[in-house]
From Swiss-Prot:
Its EC number is 3.1.1.96. This is D-aminoacyl-tRNA deacylase. An aminoacyl-tRNA editing enzyme that deacylates mischarged D-aminoacyl-tRNAs. Also deacylates mischarged glycyl-tRNA(Ala), protecting cells against glycine mischarging by AlaRS. Acts via tRNA-based rather than protein-based catalysis; rejects L-amino acids rather than detecting D-amino acids in the active site. By recycling D-aminoacyl-tRNA to D-amino acids and free tRNA molecules, this enzyme counteracts the toxicity associated with the formation of D-aminoacyl-tRNA entities in vivo and helps enforce protein L-homochirality. It is an enzyme of class 3 (hydrolase).
Amino acid sequence: MRAVVQRVDGASVSVAGATDDPSAPGVVGEIVGEGLCVLVGVTHDDTPQKAAQLARKLWSVRVLEGEKSCSDVNAPLLVISQFTLYGDARKGRRPTWNAAAPGEVAEPLVDEVVAQLRALGARVETGRFGADMRVSLTNHGPFTVIIEV
């Protein structure tokens, strides 16, 4: 599993069709104040154990102001699935997605990351798996780190 973790002062994700107007994007997840926006990618050999390991790492990694973790200050996380984290653009002009797990494999593992975070006591908001999403955030720093488990 691969996660791109950004320290934010607020973030939201919206999806077209999430409101009564199918063409208007509606907010499906939002965090206010200091927290983490986490983009999660899944590859073929990922397991529920790796999802739990990633959740523990996200909850305890000290990347917030003052070298604090989300668990230290009860900061929220916005978790968004993103298969493109396993894209490969080394050859040609078009990336390949061969390393990304198919949706039927990836979705339950992203859900497991979220469930494990919540079991640890985290406040978690999410995007919508497989949807065309719009992510808005205020990056604090900017501070971005990649975590692989």
